[in-house]
Amino acid sequence: MTYRPDIDGLRAVAVIAVILFHLNTNWLPGGFLGVDIFFVISGYLIGGILYRELSTGTFSLKRFYLRRMRRILPAFFAVVVFTLIVGAQLMVPGSDEWNTARSSAKWSVFFGGNFFSALNTDYFAPTVEVQPLNHLWSLAVEEQFYFIYPLILWAIMGIIKRILPPASSSLTRCVNVVLTALAIASFALAFLPISLHGTALVPYYLPHLRFGELLIGAILAVAVAQGNLQPSAKTATFVGSLSILVLIACLVLPFPNTTPWFPGFAAALPCIASAGIIYAGARPYWFASALSHRAVVFVGKISYSLYLWHWPLLAFAHYALGRELSNTVLAATALLIVLLSLASYHLIEQPLRHLQWSFGRTGLVYYLLPTLLVAGLYMQGRKMPTEMEQFVSCGVPRGTEKVLTYTTIGKQNNTPNVLIVGNSYTIQLRDFFDKVAKAEGWCGILSGVSGTFPHHLEKQKPISREEFQKIYDNISLTGDWDKELNNLRSQRIISDLPKFKTIIISLNWWHPETYSKALPEVLSTIGFLHKQGKHIIVVNSCMSYNTARLAETYCSVRQKTVTLSALQSENYLRGTAYHLGENRVQATKQAINTRFPQVEWLDLVPFIPHSLLHNGKSILCNPTHINIYGANYLADRFIESGQHLIAPVPSSHSR
């Protein structure tokens, strides 16, 4: 294939779009589509090579993957190793962020990082900004495509050649009809949601929804392979100009990024525009000339290194500072991205790409040995220092661990007569309730199941402790296991309900789903408990804050100096999400008090310090949960205030 400098120029457009979007989403709202441009370019270049080699009988699967290893692996492993080494020093051992980085590295070396992301991360969620290897999802998708596409194309061409007469000129047309059908099917599959063990997969990362984008490039490559689909100068100018206008509009304007349209049929628009630019670039016209400028081409040549290095550096900056990055920090980070990318391109990517080693030696040095190094780094720092646990944990097990908390708190020699019930926002307050109960001289049962609230108690049947334990042990982490846990918890509650005089309900009242979906169930449960003569207290314990990074906590524990002036701004800490949540909390309080004026309301948010810090240490383990240290701090503040959670004579007024 003749070298096309304009295609390297288009690579430059793609990588700049992605980096600008990640620097600040407002700068280029559709910048995430740069990845889709990369997919089209890849499909065109590699798809074209595959088609020509299969057509001439010169294709070798071994040679194909040898080229892929030389092209992809050296810089890829350099970034993964760098990320694990830096992450081990910067991130809190055992924290969600560090565990996610390690797991992402593990999945990525097997080119399955997109599946890990699909199980855990919304691409557009704020939490992504501190996940340093999340961007490797696109590389995984591309490699998954090339694991199967050579075989699919070989099969398609073989079948068509058997059907058509020898030397038929219809081969190209027939191949493209099949590839087009596959591309349309890929986009259409976005209308079929997929879940694994009851967990919905994030469509953004799924390969079968992205293969259509690579196929658009491959379809163009097949169409032009015979040399009879070359544009005239006039056609090139028209198609190229129209395509660049469409692509600019997609990048500059807010682009739909939700299922089922993206990924899906909406992605076809920027992809077809990218293919149009590639098609038109076969003839010199104004934009092809601009893309072929030496400076633009050079950016395109180092685009792979730029893409690999930009996200870990930005993620570490977000993590270390725990706040929105200033323009000065962004500029410094951008400079570091360029410098590391240049070093990577000249010292790693290019020298190792051109070593003419055998397939076995290349696989050993480029893949197996680096994978063993990553495995060694993965095994390091797995345990959290004991002194860190109270800052990093909110008492809620991470991941999909089966958890049903049903534990005694408070004065242990008393009979439990208080039930504290809810989800993770109940579990996070275990130390708060335990310390307050001991100070007030009562004993209770704390029951929490992450993400759920007991409902339909009136329909539950009592269950013995033996039955409870047997059912619990047999619940497997498949299907709707969380609902099974909640149902089992409800049965346990109804069994013990007669001995409880007071019921305390603690949920994430600020969350939109709690307000829209869970509140009717809560009101129904309160009504049932009220009929049973129970004294009911509703607790609001936390909100959604703009920051709760653990970097400042980690530095404080290590006795390092930390500048937290940027965290002192109430406007920053308590942003849009906080104020919207505050409105939902007040609406919830009003809804409960309107129907059940005798229900008490205890708001712990006023006890949370303005800076979210106490003695220089964070009281939150993430933007929405109090850590163990914070729960003890709130208990001390509450006790010092002179208030009572369980007063000697239950009060009928709202706290």
Model-derived segments and their meaning:
Residues 256-258, 320-331, 335-342, 346, ...:
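Extracellular/periplasmic envelope-modification machinery, especially enzymes
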Residues 1-357, 654:
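Membrane-interface helix/loop caps of multi-pass membrane proteins
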